[in-house]
Amino acid sequence: MERSITEKTLYHVAKSYDNRFVLSCSFGAPEGMVIIDMLSKHFKDFSVCTIDTGRLPQATYNLIDRAKEKYKFNLDVIYPEFDLLQKMINEKGMNSFYASEENQQECCNIRKVLPFDKYLKENKAKAVITGLRKDQSETRKDTKLIELDKYENCAKINPIYDWTRERVMGYVEHHNVPINSLHQEGYESVGCAPCSRPGIGRDGRWWWLNDDAPKECGLHFDKGGGI
């Protein structure tokens, strides 16, 4: 079956990096939970990292606890650097991201990108596993299984890059994988609470931006396009 092929690929990729890999999971999309479920079948001891921006909805925190209880993974919670966050808020306010795309990118950079880059360097990770898929958005259409040019000295592995959403949700149902409760309210993608609303794909993310603006925070893609 195709799913078993994906699981074998994930297993061999993880082994090829001497288990020095980390799964990056937002707990705001079902893809990350699918990969956690797959990893749990082959590794008793693996790490999941997630970024707590300070603006996440309660449903996301609830899922983190449910997933931790079911799969028993090691959880690393990454937080923004206090001084940078404080400076931005004092200069531009709590919700500066609504004012412009530039402010949105600045907020995402401080709350997500910089803390994540620091985490990878400090932990000397050789590979980051993500739940990116090609059909999630126009920005992600060129996503590949293995990508090498985003993170310094660290590969990015996208084991379900060629899956459809229907296949993801089929796996969730068949394997009883816990997912964010906001998906039942029409959110296909959940990020920070003030930056997410119900929508297909990533349409509900940063909805106030122009339609041609990349709906990306910068974690996986540089501003203006994919890898």
Map each language-model feature to its residues.
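Nucleotide-activated chemistry modules centered on ATP-dependent adenylation/adenylyltransferase
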Residues: 1-227
